[in-house]
Amino acid sequence: MADYKEYLDKIRNSQLLYFDSFPLDMTSCEYNVHLLLNKMAESRKSYLLLMDNERFSDAVLIAGHLLENAAVINYISASLQEDNTKQISKYLARETVQTLCDLFKFVGDDNVDAETQETIDFIMDDFKSRCDIVVLKKAKQTHEELVQVISKATTNSEKFKIIKNNYELPVVEDYLRPLRTDLSKFYGFPDIDKKLVLFYSSYCKIKHCGAAMYAPILCEDKVVMNKSQYRDLSPIVVWMCLEYTEKNIKTILNKVCQKR
C-alpha cells in the first residue's frame, strides 16, 4: 500500500466537482447533495494546506468532516437507488430536528433580532410539516400534540428540551456504516473497515478532547508528540472518499435530479 505522500499526490490530483451557484428550483435532496459536494471540495483544499504545514492532528479534523460528508452523500444516493423515500424523509427530518435544537441552544432565552426569529419560524414550519412519526420517539403524545406544547412554551430552553426528549437526532453511524461497507467492496484492500473505524475513533477523540488526548513525552525539557500516527492515518481515508465520490458523481446527480 502507498505511503502517505503518494496519497497526498493523489488527493492533489482530485477533480471533485464544485458548484459556484445552485439552481433556484432544486429539491431538498438536490440541494443537500450539491452542498455536501462543495463542502468536500473545500475540505480537500484545507486538508492539503494543513498536511503541507505538518499540522497533522488538525488535518484529521478536516478529514473526518470530509468523511462524514461523503457518507451522507452515499446514504442519500443509496436510498434513492432503492427508492427508499422513508430513509430520505428520515434523514431530512433528523437534520431539521438538529437544526432547530442548535438554533434554540445558540439563541438561548435572550431577546432575538427579527432576522433570527424569522429563521427560527421558517425552520419551525419545516419541523411541523416534516418531523412526524418518522423521527418521533416512543412518546405518549402525537406529533401534532407536541407541536402545540412547543408553541405554548415560553422560553427557547423549554422548546429545546421538549424537542430533544421526543424526537430523534441524526445518528452519524447510520451514515458511516454503509460507506464503510461500500468502500471495502470497491477497493478490496485488507482491513479497510478496521482502518476507517480506527480513523473515525481518532477523529472523534481529537474533535472532542483536543490536545488533552495526546500522551506527550518529556524529552530534554521539550514536549514531543507522536505526529506520525496522524500523518499516516488520514491520507488514505481522504483519498478513498474523494475518488469513490468522483467515480460515482454522475450516477448520484442523475438519481437526485430524477426525483424532481
Question: What role is predicted for each listed range?
Answer:
Residues 1-31, 94-239, 244-260:
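Secondary-shell segments that build the walls of catalytic and ion/ligand-binding clefts
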Residues 63-64, 70-110:
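Internal, hydrophobic cores of structured domains that mediate oligomerization or house catalytic pockets
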Residues 58, 77, 84-85, 214, ...:
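Residue-level signal for alpha-helical context at structural boundaries
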Residues 21-79:
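Long, hydrophobic/aromatic-enriched structural stretches that serve as scaffold segments
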